[in-house]
Amino acid sequence: MVATSGSSIWMRRLRRALARRPHHLMRAGRALGVVGGVMAAGGAYAIDLPEDRADAMYHFYDGGGTRADGPALLIRKKVADRLSISGSYFIDSVSNASIDVVTTASPYKEKRTEYSLGADYVYRDAQVSLSGTTSDEPDYKANSVSLDVSQEVFGGMTTISLGASRGADHVGSRYEGMFDRAQHWRYRFGVTQILTPRWLMSANLEAISDNGYLGNPYRVAQVFGTLVQERYPRTRSSRALKLRAVGDIGQGEQRAALRAEYRYFWDNWEIKAHTLEVGYTRYFGAEWLGEAFVRYNTQKQALFYSDNAQSETLYVSRNKQLSDFNDVGIGAKATYSAGKIADKFDVKWNAQYQFMRFRYKNFTDIRTHGLYSFDANILELFVSATF
């Protein structure tokens, strides 16, 4: 279990990004000059299968006393005119000396591996995607299955998508072995609309239901200055709404794109979070594609969070992920198109760096008694080959 808000949140985002790269929003991109950093032209009439491709990536995270790195692989191949299969492999090697660990326990190292298999089937203007994922680490085992369906309507100008995921986890600790379970349901609905030949917009709503053991066996809370084991509710219901706009703002060889995203998250633990991200993408010549982006996130604390509780309650947590905090991220990405290799493989080299700064408003470092904050550095290097 990774115990820092920055690293755990980032690694979940990274795994999701790898799973959907590079077909993300490609269908809508056929009607734009630039969409989210992928530039294409043409008309939108029917859904195409994702390209045959292979991706290899190295990821690195360093922040808040936690260091995580490892490789990731993704392979996708068409096996029929309408069917494509994919598989991915992901490793996190974590060295954890975060504030949660060094103040209540000893630093530790662990490795997490994840495997996934998926299939995409297209028929006319519809696509069905089925995938399964299994993740294993010394004290946590997770399995999930997802089903997503998308349908283009109104001549390809609108795409409607529906999806559902089911997860089943085994929760443990280094001291007790596996001692409990957790279950997760996720339901998704989205609409992507081409507004003009240069602009599109999407809206996505997700509902999440969790039950079982939802805490962390290594984390403790403070009650009257005394350390006690955290106590979490065994159920949680969450909602997330995301709005995204992407547009082509370039002309001729000065092709460029601008994107803006807003996400609102709320749950029955009374957490509320707002996230805003803006990005700019531009070609530099025929071979180089650059992107710069900035992201801001702010969160309000959970009902049962307390830095140092002054009364006994049924639930209590000092998990900084549930506190009041904000984070700012700024990053850049560069893509180099190397062209054809062996007259078959179209190769692209990619590098992305992001700097993040976390500031906590009501979580203190018990070593210094000051409000806690930390900075994080994130690096991704990957190569993609279509064939």
How would you describe each model-predicted region?
Residues 67-71, 111-115, 122, 141-145, ...:
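Residues that define the transmembrane beta-barrel architecture of outer-membrane proteins
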Residues 73-77, 117-121, 147-151, 189-193, ...:
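Residues on the lipid-exposed face of transmembrane beta-strands in outer-membrane beta-barrel proteins
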